[in-house]
């Protein structure tokens, strides 16, 4: 479902973007979790991949339910322009709605995750064991 949304949305998005993350292993999720904790860098997630899982991780149906994206500014990656992330996220949410696929944007969360989009209700779907 998420692939359908991205394929349609990327055609007429207000800004060019590309997917940077999709399905993640628990090990990789934990590496991201360690940023800003045991490794240098800013905290980028509250999900450690083992106790608290991310919707990027595989669910029982074999799919991840989240993606991260980055705004493209020519050939450069623009990680910092909130308004561009908001515009692309709004567009993704609208395309999802048109296709009957409800999405959530990480920019609406208390812990802001502007490059993150996931299928609404993904937290209720069991993870693969």
Describe each PLM feature range.
Residues 47-48, 52-129:
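Catalytic cores and adjacent binding grooves of peptidoglycan-active enzymes
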Residues 4, 27, 87:
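Short, well-structured alpha-helical interface segments that form or flank functional binding sites
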Residues 13, 36, 96-99:
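Sec/Tat-exported extracytoplasmic proteins
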Residues 19-32, 111:
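Acidic helix-start/capping segments at beta-turn-to-alpha-helix junctions
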Residues 8, 31, 91-94:
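Residue-level signal for well-ordered alpha-helical scaffold segments within enzymatic catalytic domains
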Residues 31-39:
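Glycine-rich loop at the start of a catalytic domain that most often binds anionic cofactors/ligands
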Residues 40-45:
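Short hydrophobic/aromatic-enriched beta-strand-loop microsegments
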């Amino acid at each position: 479902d998420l692939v359908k949304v991205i394929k349609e949305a990327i055609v007429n998005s207000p800004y060019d973007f590309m997917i940077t993350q999709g399905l993640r292993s628990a090990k990789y999720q934990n590496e991201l979790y360690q940023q800003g904790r045991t490794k240098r860098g800013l905290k980028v997630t509250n999900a450690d991949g083992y106790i608290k899982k991310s919707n990027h991780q595989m669910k029982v149906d074999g799919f991840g339910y989240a993606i991260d994206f980055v705004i493209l500014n020519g050939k450069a990656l623009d990680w910092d322009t909130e308004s561009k992330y908001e515009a692309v996220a709004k567009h993704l949410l609208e395309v999802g709605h048109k296709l009957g696929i409800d999405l959530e944007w990480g920019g609406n969360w208390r812990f802001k995750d502007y490059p993150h989009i996931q299928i609404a209700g993904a937290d209720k779907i069991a993870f693969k064991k």
